[in-house]
């Protein structure tokens, strides 16, 4: 079968708009399969389009099985690429730093970012409510990459990730960049 081009892979369908964000609105939207995604023009106007992304990937974690050989391959790759470096993978350690780094990373890669200051502040508030979480990767004490996600009920909703450290640290390469992003 033919693999679609990047722009053909996903379709974002707007289902509604809101004039602001709140924890209640985020939770309600996520439980209905929708999430806010403003562009620069919407953000300047204070509007938040809510939509759905098709196709949507759902991983049933009860069925995920990391085989012994897969765990060994990951461990060996980490040892091979990070030998002599202090590597830490942390959960919920530095949410504010991670989300700010993600926003900056995506701002530099495009003309602006869909992550408005209001959205960043909202996810920080959701983190304080133990709804939003992060995983961060640190190399020699410096943030190397991270991701954040939202937990509502029994579902985890993956958000954005970044690996800004990959371009600057001599020990990082394209292969290790993928490991940082997957953290």
Residue positions per predicted region:
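N-acyltransferase acceptor-side catalytic subdomain
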Residues: 1-183
């Amino acid at each position: 079968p033919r693999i679609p081009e990047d722009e053909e892979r996903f379709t974002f369908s707007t289902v509604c708009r809101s004039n602001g964000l709140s924890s209640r609105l985020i939770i309600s939207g996520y439980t209905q399969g929708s999430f806010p995604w403003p562009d620069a023009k919407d953000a300047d106007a204070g509007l938040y389009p809510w939509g759905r992304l098709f196709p949507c990937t759902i991983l049933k974690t009860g069925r995920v099985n990391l085989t012994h050989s897969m765990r060994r391959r990951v461990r060996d790759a980490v040892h091979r690429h990070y030998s002599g470096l202090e590597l830490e993978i942390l959960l919920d350690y530095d949410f504010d730093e991670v989300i700010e780094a993600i926003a900056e990373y995506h701002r530099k890669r495009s003309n602006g970012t869909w992550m408005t200051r209001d959205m960043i502040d909202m996810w920080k508030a959701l983190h304080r409510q133990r709804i939003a979480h992060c995983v961060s990767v640190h190399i020699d004490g410096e943030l190397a990459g991270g991701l954040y996600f939202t937990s509502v009920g029994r579902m985890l909703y993956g958000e954005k990730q970044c690996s800004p450290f990959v371009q600057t640290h001599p020990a990082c390469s394209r292969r290790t960049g993928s490991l940082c992003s997957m953290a």
